[in-house]
Amino acid sequence: MAKWGRQGNRRLTAVFIGVVVVLLAAACGGRQNQPTNDTGVAVTAQPAATAVGETELRITLTAADGRPVSGAAVQVRGDMSHAGMVPVLRTALPGDAGVYTAPFEWTMAGDWVLTVEFTLADGRTGTETFDFSIPTP
């Protein structure tokens, strides 16, 4: 059996130290955003009669006490319930009283899942999903 020798021990030590440094950096890295489950989310489409084509989504964020939540960053992802479709991605713009709007296009009839992801001003995050059914024209 071959001996490691000094050079082999140095390499092994260097690798070990490198692994420890990487693990410590990952463990001590940036602050993780804390999820929130006390923010209410509602989504409506304007016009209310959903059909294939352009619409405006209105996303309303409310605190647990019912107050509107302003200052959030809101992203919307629309996916068909079946595989093979390209998702529709939008950034919602802030409006009045915790209402955020996003232009959106229902690209085809069928069942859709809208995922709303938001980051509050204090860094907490949340995700809610909503089902929409778009009728065949």
Regions found by a protein language model. Give the residues of each.
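Sec-dependent bacterial lipoprotein signal peptides
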Residues: 1-26
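N-terminal soluble domains immediately following signal/targeting peptides that reside
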Residues: 28-137
